[in-house]
Amino acid sequence: MTSELKKTPLYQNYVDSGAKIVEFGGWAMPVQFTSIKEEHNAVRYEVGMFDVSHMGEISIKGNDASKFVQYLLSNDTNNLTDTKAQYTALCNEEGGIIDDLVTYKIGDNDYLLIVNAANTDKDFAWVQKHAPKFDVEVSNVSNQFGQLAVQGPKARDLVSGLVDIDVSEMKPFDFQQNVTLFGKNVILSQSGYTGEDGFEIYCEAKDTVDIWNGFIEHNVVPCGLGARDTLRLEAGLPLHGQDLTESITPYEGGIAFAAKPLIEEDFIGKSVLKDQKENGSERRTVGLELLDKGIARTGYPVLDLDGNEIGEVTSGTQAPSSGKSIAMAIIKRDEFEMGRELLVQVRKRQLKAKIVKKNQIEK
């Protein structure tokens, strides 16, 4: 299975620890080390860590770098500083989401885009396509980086004792460069994909194993993609390729905060997003809780109580924290009403569900 798949610097660690390895976005990645529920609960209640070195990194440098980054991205990049990162979207001309990503301003005219692993090549091709109009140099630097995510309510106290900076006041998307961790130079970002406090750590690829092992020695639970998915779904955080796609806009996909179409600067997809901001989008993303027994999977139709199709499930799972069957779905905007009962078509059965908040973390 793994011969043709890409591997992170930690691949041998997965094998040695007996992790269950699966294909994900062209990579051989651990879906679980022990059990998804154990790993999920470690992050929800204590602290766990993920290898996210498969994520892509795209560097944009040059005299027009700040202009180019704004032209590519839907958020207002004027808010970026060399200590404040930003969640944003790479949109096409129709406002559809090519990828959702995080932007770091490393320095003047020096930016780093952190993109989803499965989309790295596609994103880089898109960036290259639009670069010639600007005085910029773009590079896919993914192989230079390792990335770990240390997440959970106890993550801050743990990391605080291991780095040479004060992390106590760091807020979401605050970051610091040139931080020393286990003797290695890292970028430390207060961010994650779990609904919990925590940090994402960017290091040189060659340092990834030493940093991972350092956390293992501090009894941090290694976690796989299975728990990463249940944690993000409980928190109502979208996954590109399911909840966000090239035919779903930020307003439809529930990430309107990452679109700023009223700014002066132009960006790709701006006119469509401006229209949706002013007039509303035809669809919206909602949280669902299934009232009947079953799991709502990606692509299952969502119906009104008369059996008319009004949307589809984009992600679904059984929430380890609450035991409830939860989902995210995209439905016609005028069908939305919090608490409304709907049906989900699960094979030949129609299961009752109700619209709830997307963030369904219950402790």
UniProtKB/Swiss-Prot annotation:
InterPro entries: GCS_T (IPR006223), GCS_T_bac (IPR022903), GCST_C (IPR013977), GCV_T_N (IPR006222), GcvT/YgfZ/DmdA (IPR028896), GcvT/YgfZ_C (IPR029043), TrmE/GcvT_dom1 (IPR027266). Pfam families: GCV_T, GCV_T_C. GO terms for cellular component: cytosol; glycine cleavage complex. One of its GO terms (biological process) is glycine decarboxylation via glycine cleavage system. Keywords: Aminotransferase, Transferase. The gene is gcvT. Gene3D superfamilies: Aminomethyltransferase beta-barrel domains, Aminomethyltransferase fragment, Probable tRNA modification gtpase trme, domain 1. It is an enzyme of class 2 (transferase). The keyword Transferase applies. The lineage of its organism: Bacteria, Bacillati, Bacillota, Bacilli, Bacillales. The glycine cleavage system is composed of four proteins: P, T, L and H. Its EC number is 2.1.2.10. Belongs to the GcvT family. The keyword Transferase applies. Transmembrane segments: none annotated. SUPFAM superfamilies: Aminomethyltransferase beta-barrel domain (SSF101790), Folate-binding domain (SSF103025). It catalyses: N(6)-[(R)-S(8)-aminomethyldihydrolipoyl]-L-lysyl-[protein] + (6S)-5,6,7,8-tetrahydrofolate = N(6)-[(R)-dihydrolipoyl]-L-lysyl-[protein] + (6R)-5,10-methylene-5,6,7,8-tetrahydrofolate + NH4(+). GO terms for molecular function: aminomethyltransferase activity; transaminase activity. This is Aminomethyltransferase. The glycine cleavage system catalyzes the degradation of glycine.
